[in-house]
């Protein structure tokens, strides 16, 4: 008998169709592209551009957007440290399922804490976890401020805002690092092409 978490008498039910068969059907390899960075660094912009470019190549992807998930799956969570940990854990579990289904899952979240991202990497399997660090300066992100959140944080209307009064821990060994150029975020297409080039080189866009 197996005991899982707080539940007892729970057993893992194997599927009659495995990941290998699903990948063969889709002619691609399931993986998780985990996009992390400050608010306003271009995470959602990259996620949307990447999904579009993959679709143009006949590859199936799905975006897990941090804000969108807080409308449903994670709507019961706030922004305290423990809630942020649980937020990332849940997204990691869902991303793992998408990758197992053979999809290219694009997770777009600030995910500020290194240990939480590393936990997702371990959960999903290192070889299928591609961490993309949007290495954009706080100054650039605050200047962009597409949602007006930095202005609210500076005014004291948002507490615990990443980059202002809560830390962001940069990745130490990410697969892809995208940097600003002359104080500007690279174009969406250019960023997407860099990620796609990595996926191609690592064999994720074909099933062999």
In which residue ranges do the predicted regions lie?
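Extreme N-terminal, non-catalytic leader segments
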Residues: 1-32
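The conserved Walker
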Residues: 39
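Small-molecule kinase domains that catalyze NTP-dependent phosphoryl transfer to phosphate-bearing small molecules
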Residues: 135-193, 198, 202-208
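Conserved beta-strand scaffold positions in the cores of enzyme catalytic domains, especially
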Residues: 63, 129-131, 175-177
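Hydrophobic anchor at the beta1->P-loop junction of P-loop NTPases
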Residues: 35
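Conserved lysine of the Walker
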Residues: 43
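ATP-dependent NMP and nucleoside kinases share a basic, alpha-helical "lid"
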Residues: 72-83, 93-154, 160
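Conserved substrate/cofactor phosphate-moiety recognition/catalytic segment
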Residues: 48-96
């Amino acid at each position: 008998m197996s005991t899982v978490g707080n539940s007892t008498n729970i057993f893992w039910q194997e599927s009659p169709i495995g990941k290998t068969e699903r990948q063969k059907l889709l002619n691609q390899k399931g993986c998780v592209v985990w996009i992390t960075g400050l608010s306003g660094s271009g995470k959602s912009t990259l996620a949307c551009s990447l999904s579009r470019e993959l679709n143009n190549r006949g590859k199936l992807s799905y975006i897990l957007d941090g804000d969108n998930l807080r409308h449903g799956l994670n709507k019961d969570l706030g922004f305290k440290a423990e809630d942020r940990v649980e937020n990332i854990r849940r997204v990691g579990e869902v991303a793992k399922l998408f990758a197992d289904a053979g999809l290219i899952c694009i997770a777009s979240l600030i995910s500020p804490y290194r240990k939480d991202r590393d936990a997702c990497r371990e959960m999903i399997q290192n070889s299928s976890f591609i961490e993309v660090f949007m290495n954009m300066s706080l100054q650039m992100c605050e200047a962009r401020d597409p949602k007006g959140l930095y202005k609210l944080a500076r005014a004291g209307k948002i507490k615990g805002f990443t980059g202002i009064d809560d830390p962001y821990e940069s990745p130490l060994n990410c697969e892809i690092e995208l940097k600003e150029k002359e104080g500007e975020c690279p174009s969406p297409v250019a960023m997407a092409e860099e990620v796609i080039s990595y996926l191609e080189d690592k064999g994720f866009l074909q099933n062999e």
